[in-house]
């Protein structure tokens, strides 16, 4: 077996839709085609939105499709726990490393203040934090804490972080200009995705991260966190987003085709074959198992632009 360790890192807030399934398929194929393995980590930081029964369903769905993980989830393994809701003490340890470096500060900004019309925005519409609370005095912090419980941000340097994505190619961002100081912890104490994912991937031995292109812009700040925390960074492969026939992003909230509905009409092989077809891995939407696709898998066959699902394919 090769040293490649891929992973699934789903948030179990509902049944998986086609976009989630496509990401899992590519993650599995990318790892298995080089003789590697796949770890399943359940990203249930928000335990209210992500009940355990959804996590169990998700794991069963992956097995039904032939995409079962080698480690993690209910199967367990040597680097657990594999549920983020059970890893708070681990996140606390690494959070405190950043606190000791003097990089963490309280933020009292409300949602309306952050999204005000005059707030800095990226070209994709995301808000870049203006640093409003970065230089508050100790006295100001004490006063504001009596009025509002703060969230906690990390100070980023005026530095450009660049890397070569395994699928999308070169990418770079200036942390101060394009990202801004970002959240590490919510006001209710829950740790933020950016910190948790970095700590988890490093401690679970993940060497290859496959995820949607919507997370490409998160990578520079995560690479910076890996460096600040002294953790090894994986390789990244960002896949194109799967869009509905009308150009919308697929969403659990919008009721887009979930696996629950697909299972009533298709076999696992039919679903996998159709996903492989839209990803460029085969020329016709014939039924296939993941194992049948692994031998000939190549990222060069996967498009870089977003994929619009053909009408009537599912």
Residue ranges: model-predicted function:
Residues 1-122, 213-214, 218-231, 288:
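N-terminal Rossmann-like or analogous alpha/beta NTP/dinucleotide-binding catalytic cores
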Residues 17, 81-89, 146-148, 194-199, ...:
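Noncatalytic linker/hinge segments flanking ATPase motor cores
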Residues 82-97, 121-128, 148-158, 278-293:
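Short secondary-structure transition/capping segments
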């Amino acid at each position: 077996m090769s040293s490649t360790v891929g992973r699934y890192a789903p948030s179990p807030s509902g049944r998986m839709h086609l976009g989630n399934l496509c990401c899992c398929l590519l993650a599995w194929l990318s790892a298995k085609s080089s003789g590697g393995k796949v770890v399943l980590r359940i990203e249930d930081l928000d335990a209210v939105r992500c009940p355990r029964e959804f996590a169990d369903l998700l794991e069963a769905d992956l097995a039904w499709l032939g995409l079962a993980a080698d480690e993690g989830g209910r199967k367990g393994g040597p680097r657990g726990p594999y549920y983020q809701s059970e890893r708070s003490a681990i996140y606390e340890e690494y959070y405190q490393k950043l606190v000791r470096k003097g990089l963490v500060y309280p933020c009292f900004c409300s949602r309306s203040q952050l999204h005000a019309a005059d707030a800095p925005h990226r070209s994709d519409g995301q808000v870049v934090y203006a640093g409003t609370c970065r230089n508050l005095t100790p006295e100001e912090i004490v006063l504001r804490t009596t009025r509002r419980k703060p969230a906690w941000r990390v100070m980023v340097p005026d530095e450009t972080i660049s890397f070569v994505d395994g699928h999308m190619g070169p990418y770079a961002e200036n942390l101060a200009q394009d990202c801004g100081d970002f959240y590490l912890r919510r006001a209710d104490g829950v740790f933020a995705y950016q910190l948790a994912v970095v700590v988890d991937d490093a401690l679970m031995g993940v060497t290859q991260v496959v995820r949607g292109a919507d997370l490409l812009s998160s990578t520079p700040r995560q690479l910076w966190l890996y460096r600040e925390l002294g953790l090894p960074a994986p390789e990244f492969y960002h896949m194109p987003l799967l869009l509905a026939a009308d150009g919308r992003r697929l969403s659990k909230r919008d009721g887009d085709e979930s696996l629950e509905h697909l299972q009533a009409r298709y076999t696992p092989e039919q679903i996998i074959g159709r996903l492989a077809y839209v990803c460029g891995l085969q020329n016709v939407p014939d039924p296939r198992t993941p194992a049948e696709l692994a031998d000939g898998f190549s990222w060069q066959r996967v498009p870089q632009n977003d994929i619009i699902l053909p009408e009537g394919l599912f």
